[in-house]
């Protein structure tokens, strides 16, 4: 690993409380699962979706859309039936919610020390010990350290991204982790939480963004549990998974492969047909060195768009079942 901070950016680069568990089964035919991957992953997923749409495959018609971290942003837009052109324009905007062309407010901030987070994520990858307990350790650390972006600034940026504050009419869920005990939280329209706040909680990368407070609980990035949380779609007949972190040649990214493979097996064992889309060689080249690099949004969108068009024939067979 060239640097711990660079590697962990991949993760960013990943009511009453509506609590979901991996044992819950979903109903419906088609599930779209959008994984985390920072601003570059957000752009790539948006491009893939636009490319598929241009070939006649409308993923917004999914019976269930599950988004984690960057995928939560894309999923909320798609579930709201945002046109492909608007989806791409939104993906090109800086992460702080400023209009395209304006500098990201974090650009002058020093890189955070994420060595603790990296160590804990790699500990989780070994499969030893309680996964939830390790997530709780990460949550405790996230509440203790000084983030690059404060909670108020972070949540405000999501209110700018989603000014309507209303949940989409279609079934859409986003994933976060309770910082106190490491438990999974699945947010939906029935959770009684404003959409921007729920999505922000799914994107609150520990050490970079402050945990997000909802109903006296604090929440961190859903990617701490899984970069896709694909197992939560168990019970659906068909699942399409977009996973931008599965391609980058980085030690931490490779560590995500084992848990994702387990999630895909869980779906398959439940009788679900699964298709996984990961970045192709052209997309990987467009990504640059890290999924956290805002300057690679446009190349990632363009590469994803081409990849989506190229994948359309294969995806059409799955999506039409």
Give short role names for the model-derived ranges:
Residues 1-9:
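Bacterial N-terminal signal peptides that target proteins for export
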Residues 8-18:
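Bacterial N-terminal signal peptides
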Residues 19-66, 76-321:
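Patatin-like phospholipase
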Residues 67, 71:
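Gly/Ala-rich beta-loop-alpha elbow adjacent to hydrolase catalytic centers
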């Amino acid at each position: 690993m060239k640097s711990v901070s660079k590697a962990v950016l991949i993760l960013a680069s990943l009511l009453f409380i509506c609590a979901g568990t991996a044992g819950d089964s979903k109903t419906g035919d088609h599930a779209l699962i959008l994984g985390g991957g920072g601003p570059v992953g957000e752009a790539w997923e948006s491009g893939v979706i636009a490319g598929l749409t241009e070939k006649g495959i409308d993923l917004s018609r999914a019976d269930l859309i599950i988004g984690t971290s960057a995928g939560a942003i894309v999923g909320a837009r798609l579930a709201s039936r945002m046109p492909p052109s608007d989806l791409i324009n939104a993906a090109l905007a800086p992460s702080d919610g400023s209009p395209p062309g304006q500098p990201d407010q974090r650009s002058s901030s020093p890189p955070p020390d994420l060595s603790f987070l990296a160590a804990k994520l790699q500990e989780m990858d070994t499969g030893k010990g309680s996964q939830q307990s390790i997530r709780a350790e990460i949550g405790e650390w996230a509440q203790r350290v000084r983030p690059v972006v404060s909670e108020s600034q972070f949540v405000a940026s999501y209110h700018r991204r989603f000014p309507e504050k209303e949940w989409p009419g279609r079934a859409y869920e986003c994933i976060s982790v309770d910082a106190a005990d490491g438990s999974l939280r699945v947010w939906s329209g029935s959770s009684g939480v404003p959409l921007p706040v729920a999505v922000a909680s799914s994107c609150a990368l520990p050490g970079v963004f402050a945990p997000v407070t909802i109903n006296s609980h604090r929440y961190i990035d859903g990617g701490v549990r899984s970069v896709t949380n694909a197992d939560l779609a168990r019970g659906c007949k068909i699942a399409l998974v977009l996973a931008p972190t599965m391609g980058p040649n980085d030690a931490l990214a490779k560590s995500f492969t084992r848990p994702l493979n387990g999630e895909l097996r869980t779906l398959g064992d439940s009788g679900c047909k699964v298709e996984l889309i990961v970045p192709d060689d052209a997309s990987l080249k467009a990504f640059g060195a890290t999924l956290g690099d805002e300057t690679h949004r446009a190349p990632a969108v363009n590469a994803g768009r081409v990849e989506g068009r190229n994948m359309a024939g294969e995806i059409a067979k799955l999506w039409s079942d």
